[in-house]
Amino acid sequence: LDYIYVTQQFGVTKDSKRLYASGSHSGTDFRAIVGTPVKSVADGVVLGVGDTDLTCPYASLGKFVFIKHNNGLSSAYGHLSLIKAYQGQKIERGEVIGYSGNTGHSTGPHLHLTIYAGDGAMMTTRPSKACPGRSYTMPLAPTSAYLDPLYYLPPL
């Protein structure tokens, strides 16, 4: 995003216990009207793209892009309206990978950014808690692999 405004921070926040089963927010949310270009935070390779709404509408990330970066970190960008990247694509820092939206478990248009340590995150298929009998594939990691995105972005 070219213009940054944080709408929900990483971790335990005043709203996280009410909004998330884990009680913690897995990334940082940034205000972004639908259609705002979303850019990669660093060089890397796209490990996965998807849309959790196809399996379980209004749950999880919705349309997302998952990137493994050359610096050892990984990132996931969620609630996109349109995905412009594809699995296996080499990405440069600042390259447009999609456009912000309001897909998945979202209360309004924004970008959800998650940063993961090392090889902690991977594309994982698991049963949906929100839609019993269905499974979806998305980036997941052990709790210790989730990092605060604001520590890894340029100062706001």
Segments the model singles out, each with a brief description of its role:
Residues 5-40, 51:
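Short glycine/threonine/proline-enriched tight-turn/helix- or strand-capping micro-motif at secondary-structure
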Residues 11, 35, 51, 70-72, ...:
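Solvent-exposed coil/turn segments that connect beta secondary-structure elements
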Residues 29, 66, 76, 99, ...:
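Conserved beta-strand positions that form and line the central face of beta-propeller blades
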Residues 52, 80, 102-103, 128:
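Residue-level structural signal for beta-strand termini and adjacent loop
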Residues 86-95, 114-156:
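Acidic, glycine-rich catalytic/binding loops that coordinate metals and/or anionic ligands
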